[in-house]
Amino acid sequence: MIHSLPSPEPFVILAMPRTGTHYLEALLNDHPNILSNGELLNSYDENWPDKDRLRHSDRELLELAYMRYPPAKKKVTHVGCKINEPQFYERPGFFDELARWQGLKVILLTRNTLESLRSLVQARQTGQWLKFSPDRNEPPSVSLSVNECEAYFKAADDFHARVKDAFDPSKLLMIEYQDLLLKPSACLAAVLAFLGAPAHRFSNRATIQRQETRSLARSLRNFVELRRHFAGGPYAKFFELDDASAPQG
């Protein structure tokens, strides 16, 4: 059965892949009035009972997300979903339709782009996209080419710029993955204030675990070569900062 009552306030989480959107969403769904239903444009996402929904028009998909969303056992005043940058390629007009949705608030989650790419390559190699329990198995160390780094860095820059250009600053909140790990309470308080949702003491019951806890220097086999190549340029910062020092969880 699909919900058809007057729509709660809409929001969307936008990000590059492997930036902590599952973790943020799990924390937000702990709130008694917030419901975030996963990846709207992912046909395999189990939050959505309509597996053929991607055959709908862009407008119909957004109506499904914000007006006829799956029911929840709580009083929902804020409803959202999340979309990763590559998913817009398959629906070229969807971004503009999203930007036109009345009252939409956007949470842009960012991460050290090199960390994001390394994590993406690891997940593709192992087939493990989420981790729900701790174990001693480390993901494989990987190597990245200069070309794939440059392409990914540019894609991230272009996507972040597109989001900032498309939405009024009052409707856009930027959250850093590192801050979400190190200062979750402060980050979540900022998100609630931005959404206009009541304050809430989060239980920290999110079961999603970090898959990689090693530094870039240890998890990226050709880290030194890449750092040397990008030294002095706009992407040198990605080789100076990583989130390995952040706590797991």
Swiss-Prot record:
Its EC number is 2.8.2.-. Transmembrane segments: none annotated. The keyword Iron does not apply. The keyword Iron does not apply. It comes from the Bacteria. Pfam families: Sulfotransfer_1 (PF00685). Keywords: Nodulation, Transferase. GO terms for molecular function: sulfotransferase activity. Required for the formation of sulfated nod factor. Proposed to transfer activated sulfate (PAPS) to a N-acetylglucosamine of the nod factor. This is Nodulation protein H. It comes from Rhizobium tropici. The gene is nodH.
